[in-house]
Amino acid sequence: MTFGIIRSIFQNVVFLLTIVLFLVGIWSHLYRHESNYCEMTYMFENPTYPRISLPADVETRYPRYALHSYCEGVRCEAHRRNQFIGYPVLFIVGNADSYRQVRSLGSVAYRMGDKQKQLDYFSIDFNEELSALFGGVLDQQTEFVAHAIKTILSFYKTKKTIILVGNSIGGLLSRAVFLQPPDRFDPNTVRLIITQATPHQAAVIHADSYIMNFYSRVNQYWKDEWNNSLKHLTLLSLAGGDRDHLVRSDLTSLNGLTDESRSIDVLTSAVPYVWASTDHRCIVWCRQLVLATTRALLEIIQEKKQDSQTTMQILKQYFSPSVDLNLGINTTLTYKKDPTIITESSISIHGKEENDYVIPLKNSKFHRIIIHSTNAKIYLRNTDVTLDITNTLLPIPPTYSARKMIRFDIKQLDDSLKQYDSILIRLENKKSQTDIYQIENDEQIVELSAFDSQTLKFNQAGYVKLVFPTLSNLWQVYHIHLSSNSENTPLIHFHVPWSNEDQYNLISLRPTSSPTTNLPKPLARQMRLKLHRPALFTNGEYPSLELFLNSKSSYTLEISYSFLDFLSQLIRYYIYLLPTFLFTVLCVSYSLQVDEVTLRTYRTMLAWQIHIPVALLIAILYKIVIILFPSSTFVVNIHSNGYYFFCLPLILYFLSLSLWAMISFIIDYLIFDFIHTMLYPLLTYVSNELNQQQKFTRLIQWISLSLPLMVTLLFSGSNGHIGLFILALLHVVWRGTINQRLRRVLTTVLLFHGLLAVLNLTGFIMHIKSILIQGLYPLLMIMPDPSFLSAICCTTAFYLRFTLSQSQKQIVQVLKIIFLKYNRSILILLAVISQFFCSYSMHYLWILISFIFIHVAVIFFVPSHRD
């Protein structure tokens, strides 16, 4: 007895601890990130969005959607007359977004443009539909985009192409429009697509089959046609990084869809002069990013050659630059006096006195040279030639500065550069400054281990490069804490070789409270080592951390594992797997109740002698499937993309177990016990009275049962699921209050209904919004209804509880015997099947839940087993 109490207390403590960690993980995911260093974009005049008329048949077919132009001030009068003189850009909004979000790009373009180069921004109003969570609208939205492009181009006499800028799911629509038939859309009218926080690889949540099929069609088309019918296209994908809680940066990758010859995917933290993470909304109005985008677009439309190679060069310059020494300019220099030769490994030179400095390249003992300069000229030279390479330098933080850098790998110079024997640095004025780092011992290997910390000390080291060969998993997050006896602001650069997600020490930028001032100079600097995209391959390169320090000072670097950020990464990358594990746990719990009807749902969660083996079985089967079926969809999604680790199924299983334990305890012990106490006499009396009026009872019963079906037919499948949940709740209250033993099972079944209802909330919201625009019509008359079939099947399975209550058919009795005999095996098999077929397609859970409803009806409502 004492052991049982202790075990129960221990289990409850584990449940509570798991839920607390889950909530802490959510908090960490939402709030533990870098500050928002983006500046707000403001409009100088009142923004206006004139609505543009489309052909009558288009307006009739898509009454929920509209096309608008953006204008300010005097230009609005021309826009109202559909008179445009600039270059057309169509902004395609994302999930639940407003067409007014175009104002940031439109306003900045209006201010930066002139008569020779202007951008005319247009925006689509999708009625703020939940297109990322409800696939029934995606095809209609894509069709409307095609019609909008055709209408916009009809306003221009000479412009035959348009630029597409897609935010969130709008970026996917900008790619999907190329699948439209030729009479609706001409692929040659679009040559550049820019996407902001668009999940290209897969949907954030696989809510329904329409989303899955839409992604499959679009991505397969792009894989097949990228170098065929799409060979004129250039694509830029921007990801927000750590601050974007809605779209993970790995989903914005173009890996496998395009190649690097005509596409770029980059995190905003790596974009020059942005160097900041953006959240899902902020990426639209972040001033630094808007400026970079506008400058790039204005330069692109000025080019006479509108080919993909020219466009790509401009995009790389603004979003992912690299040093191209071939762009250097031959020049001739005169010298007032002999240059000073630099032999030190680390030195900082200032322009107090105009002077020239030379760094020898020939026979140098150093492996690498890195130069950070402000207002200085950099040259490569030999006895015959001097090459000005100042314009090839790359910008580095802080944002509002002329600070730039260049690095030379002396041992691997190109053949064309081996002719030069020195680097010349010319300080042009008193504000000129150059920091030079000549590195002999290039790298220091740091082996990171989980839940471990390391402390490194650097004395009189100007440059330090730390390489982390064991940093390869998404759940590995480490805190970097740099302290020093110097007040100089060090520059820290975190580089990930397989992804454009470089991060600079953003505290060297500006504080959010006062964007125009410099940060104070505390003695401690902090940042995180965190991956946003898993390592699919390394080619011998690993993540690295570069520290550019003051060689006259000493520094202490602490690297510590961050458990809070580990929890945050679990939420960010694995939360979408939770519905399937919730179903799995309920299956196991229900199997226990079939064997012992008196067990409450909460008590089944304490049967660890069953749950632990099932969780281990799932973890082992995961590993076996990964080994035996490496090309299966399940393995490609969870393992090949770098997301899987062995303990993942165990963590998700016990998280689901803890959540159901808490929910079932509240529902069963607190709510239903209270209802039983309050209503038992009344419901018993009403039940006895109704039993004497069988015809009247059957009529009420069938009217009640017909409501979910009618709701499905007259409204939508999502409405039907929610109606079915309400009916199941009433059934538990009615039958469960009278029959305590049956209530135990019906409570578990109610949780299955609740899971279905939650998965269908977005469809319910979509139909309510469509009613407000188009009237009280069934969803199937307005758009495809992904939940229609599942609602019909689940409702029919629910009805079996009542139709089988009078059944004496032999086949039903045989089926009941089979279900009882192989109960545990059938339900655990069902739980395992859900893991491999529904983890990434959770909309298929309704098929398995329908079987559960049939199972309940056969076992508990067929006469021979009635309570």
Language-model segments: what does each one mean?
Residues 1-18, 818-821:
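Classical eukaryotic N-terminal signal peptides for Sec-dependent ER targeting/secretion
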Residues 19-46, 220-229:
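Membrane-interface motif at the C-terminal end of an N-terminal transmembrane signal
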Residues 90-96, 122-246, 729-738, 756, ...:
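Serine-dependent carboxylesterase/thioesterase catalytic core
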Residues 111-112, 220-222, 226-233, 237-274, ...:
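Active-site-adjacent alpha-helix of alpha/beta-hydrolase-fold enzymes
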Residues 323-569, 574-577, 613:
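Preference for solvent-exposed, low-hydrophobicity sequence contexts
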Residues 68-131:
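Short, surface-exposed "cap/lid" segments of acyl-processing enzymes
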Residues 275-277, 284-315, 319:
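Hydrophobic, mid-to-C-terminal alpha-helical segments
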Residues 554-867:
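Alpha-helical transmembrane segments of integral membrane proteins
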